[in-house]
Amino acid sequence: RGNFKITDYVTERFPLKLTDVIQTADTVRLCFESYIIAKIKCDENLCTIDFEQKDDRINRFWFRVAADKEEKCYGCGEQMSYFNLRGRNFPIWTSEPGVGRDKTTYVTWRSDVENKAGGDYYNTNYPQPTFVSTNKYYLHVDSTAYADFDFRNDSFHELQIWEVPKQIRIECADTYLKLLERITTYFGRQPKLPDWVYNGLIIGVQGGNERSFGLLDKTLDRNIKVAGIWCQDWCGKRVTSFGKRLQWDWKYHKEMYPDLPKKIKEINAKGIKFWDMLIHIW
């Protein structure tokens, strides 16, 4: 079901001892005994730390970033419970959002007991090891391993990664607008939305041909402008012991949606787009 319970038992956690510093024209190499080498490169606005792991026994890594009490932090991907991350820790692990966002509520407890499907405040389909600070910098950890970003301490943020990351990147700016520009320069910018999305509502429908297009007709009958419909079960559904799921073969279901290509052409003639689960648009 895409729901995980992750626990850990740390046998040993020890601070790295700096044993050598090698400085060149544009980098500083920090050698920590025979465990890790950190290559630091900084310019006016950007600092990168590239790590070279020398001992493969290291499978956990903690990194602290100085903080202040008034600072706020945002990000860590799509976080749906709290905008400001301070005061909480956020595991970075892809999962279903789950039922409920609070383990103290009855609905979440019941979902956990019966189906292990209860959600928590940090459960998200899209976590990301990146955050933005009101001190006008962003930090990104280049790693795909499980991580936990802890913002509970007033004087530092502690980032835990279940491997030695390839790189930690910190970039700052004088304004939030400039910071956003630098973030999107690194990660990539989303393209502008097409003009047609502003033509009306984009409604979510499912349940077969009659119900889905029937809801569209009812909406149009009330003189509501519609730009498109999003239909996740266009490929059919399967009923399992843990609920309804899609067929996942990404072919239109000829029983639930007979003559779907024809229906799509009909609504296209009205200026309405059709989206499927994979965000293909007709």
Name each model-derived stretch.
Residues 1-196, 202-209, 216-221:
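Catalytic and substrate-binding clefts that recognize carbohydrates or anionic sugar/phosphate headgroups
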Residues 192-282:
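Aromatic-lined carbohydrate-binding/catalytic grooves of carbohydrate-active enzymes
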